[in-house]
């Protein structure tokens, strides 16, 4: 979906006094639940600042940082310490107020909290050697009391960091909720207040700027997060995701599914992910280095990389703990793909494609010595559009190589390319069999209906082939004597199958998944005999239409997924 320019900056008109009254009530009376106040451990704060790039080796006094809900100063005070350290290292010539006055913009709604943290900021600055006048002047420049979602913001920011408030919509006064909905397109369905906080923070980033938040991860999968996921996919790069479930990230256990995200205002790319790190400084410092490294080392330990996590409003599959629980349940309940009557294989490797593969009609060999070949280029659209390639078949039906004396056209063809063909490693090992392809070719495979799957893809790409073409070496295929292939195609196109592959697959550079046979074989499916006839039809029809959402709905029923399990894979538990 396209996003209109933010209307966050429009002033609250005097006529909208119910909005101002509701805001003032929250600022004055709101308890912790109403304000969504949650306190973050210092080790986690430093981890997020490191991930966002707000580090003392940078000229932080020349950068701008926004903290949209500073609370008791869990983030703000360490930010100030880093800023002062970087500023002193730069050997500045100006005054503290001139050099540092624009470096921080921090907002807090609650009056008492604002006053308390304001005093803590002034005290910190004085301990750091600033005069009382300079400390007060900086605190006045940096801190403001108000509603971040309504307050004016000047300019853009290199960093936005923090822990946005977590407030359910039913706790927000109706006039204020209506005002938020009018300003923020992501305030959709039952979105919590942290959703528009993320929207406004993202749109406040300068080019190349980083947002680093810790908050609930529900928006990454569920219904109300769809518009925010679209915004991120359209304009930003989800750089880092760290699953913090079951870690003591906060001083109280108040968010069920916390996660750290680093989102940058730059073109999209791969996402680095880590799960449930130990909350100690040494571990988190090492992990931040891996997650931020220009190139991920081969032995990246707990860090993995995924391509195309963001895709419009589609849910983000990030191997979170609830998804792992789903994997484990399905593994206990259903047989492996090949135990359920399916076979996974790979297309033919020749060792010399330029010699063995060419235009089918132009391959000057006997008709039974060539087969029409399907390649990744033929299936890019999701349907087979054969481009006319063919492959030479030197194998007899009995399994050995044919006698070239019985196939003069084949012999001439191969002899004309003998240097290339005989120069292959497999030919040198067995010179008498110099003209064999690396893999044996079985013509009956071409005649079998099959599902074709490219090796490396960012998402499931499963294409039905009706039984006319032989697969090339960069295509995996699935056949079955039991399952209807269209119904099976729906299963393999679904979020369930993608989760299996994402869980077990190694990742290529850039985070692309490898849909290799060994990972496809990890997929669990019911036996065909156990699938009711109406569901069989629903699966097949969804696949024929290539309607992935319809595939998901049918597949969720096939596996008997609970509301929570469906939510883990996307949607709102439907």
Curated annotation (Swiss-Prot):
GO-annotated biological processes: DNA restriction-modification system; methylation
Pfam families hit by this protein: Eco57I
Catalytic reaction(s) noted: a 2'-deoxyadenosine in DNA + S-adenosyl-L-methionine = an N(6)-methyl-2'-deoxyadenosine in DNA + S-adenosyl-L-homocysteine + H(+)
Domain of life per record: Bacteria
EC code: 2.1.1.72
Record InterPro entries: DNA_methylase_N6_adenine_CS (IPR002052), MethylTrfase_TaqI-like_dom (IPR011639), N4_N6_ade-DNA_methylase (IPR050953), SAM-dependent_MTases_sf (IPR029063)
Keywords attached to this entry: DNA-binding, Methyltransferase, Plasmid, Restriction system, S-adenosyl-L-methionine, Transferase
GO molecular function: DNA binding; site-specific DNA-methyltransferase (adenine-specific) activity
Uppermost EC category: transferase
Coiled coil: none
Complex and partners: Monomer.
Similarity section: Belongs to the N(4)/N(6)-methyltransferase family.
Protein name, as recorded: Type II methyltransferase M.PaeR7I
Upper taxonomic lineage: Bacteria, Pseudomonadati, Pseudomonadota, Gammaproteobacteria, Pseudomonadales
């Amino acid at each position: 979906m396209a996003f209109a320019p933010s209307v966050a900056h429009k002033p609250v008109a005097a006529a909208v006094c119910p909005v101002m009254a509701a805001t003032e009530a929250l600022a004055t009376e709101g308890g912790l639940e109403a304000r969504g106040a949650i306190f973050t451990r210092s080790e986690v704060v430093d981890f997020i600042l490191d991930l966002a790039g707000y580090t003392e080796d940078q000229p932080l006094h020349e950068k701008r940082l926004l903290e949209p809900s500073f609370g008791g100063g869990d983030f703000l005070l360490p930010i100030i310490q880093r800023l002062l350290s970087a500023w002193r290292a730069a050997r500045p010539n100006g005054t503290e107020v001139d050099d540092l006055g624009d470096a921080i913009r921090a907002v807090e709604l609650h009056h008492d909290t604002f006053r308390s943290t304001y005093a803590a900021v002034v005290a910190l600055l004085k301990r750091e050697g600033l005069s009382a006048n300079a400390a007060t002047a900086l605190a006045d420049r940096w801190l403001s009391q108000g509603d971040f979602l309504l307050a004016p913001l000047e300019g853009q920011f290199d960093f936005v960091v923090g822990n946005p408030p977590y407030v359910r919509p039913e706790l927000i006064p109706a006039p204020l909720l209506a005002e938020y909905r009018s300003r923020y397109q992501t305030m959709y369905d039952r979105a919590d207040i942290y959703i528009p906080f993320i929207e406004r923070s993202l749109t406040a980033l300068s080019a190349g700027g980083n947002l680093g938040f810790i908050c609930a991860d529900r928006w990454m999968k569920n219904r109300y997060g769809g518009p925010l996921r679209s915004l991120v996919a359209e304009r930003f790069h989800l750089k880092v995701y760290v699953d913090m479930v079951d870690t003591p990230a906060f001083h109280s256990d108040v968010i069920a599914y916390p996660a750290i995200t680093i989102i940058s205002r730059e073109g999209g790319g791969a996402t680095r992910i880590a799960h449930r790190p130990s909350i100690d400084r040494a571990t988190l410092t090492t992990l931040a280095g891996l997650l931020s490294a220009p190139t991920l080392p081969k032995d990246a330990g707990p860090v993995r990389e995924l391509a195309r996590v963001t895709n419009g409003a589609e849910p983000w599959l990030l191997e979170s703990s609830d998804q792992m629980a789903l994997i484990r349940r399905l593994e206990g309940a259903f047989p492996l793909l090949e135990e359920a009557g399916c076979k996974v294989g790979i297309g033919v490797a020749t060792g010399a494609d330029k010699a063995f593969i060419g235009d089918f009609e132009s391959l000057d060999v006997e008709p039974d010595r060539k087969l029409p070949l399907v390649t990744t280029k033929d299936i890019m659209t999701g349907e087979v559009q054969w481009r006319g390639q063919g492959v030479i078949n030197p194998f007899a039906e009995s399994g050995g190589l044919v006698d070239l004396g019985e196939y003069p056209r084949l012999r001439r063809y191969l002899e004309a390319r003998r240097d290339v063909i005989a120069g292959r490693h497999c030919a040198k090992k067995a010179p008498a069999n110099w003209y064999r392809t690396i893999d044996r070719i079985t013509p009956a495979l071409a005649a079998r209906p099959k599902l074709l799957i490219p090796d490396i893809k960012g998402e499931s790409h499963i294409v039905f082939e009706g039984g006319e073409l032989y697969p090339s070496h960069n295509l995996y295929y699935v056949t079955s004597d039991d399952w209807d292939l269209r119904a099976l195609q729906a299963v393999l196109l679904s979020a369930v199958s993608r989760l299996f592959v994402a869980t077990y697959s190694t990742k290529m550079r850039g985070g692309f998944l490898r849909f290799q046979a060994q990972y496809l074989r990890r997929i669990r499916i019911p036996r065909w005999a156990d699938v009711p006839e109406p569901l069989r039809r629903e699966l097949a029809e969804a696949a024929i239409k290539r309607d992935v959402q319809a595939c998901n709905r049918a597949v969720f029923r096939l596996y008997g997924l609970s509301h929570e399990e469906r939510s883990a894979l996307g949607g709102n538990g439907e």
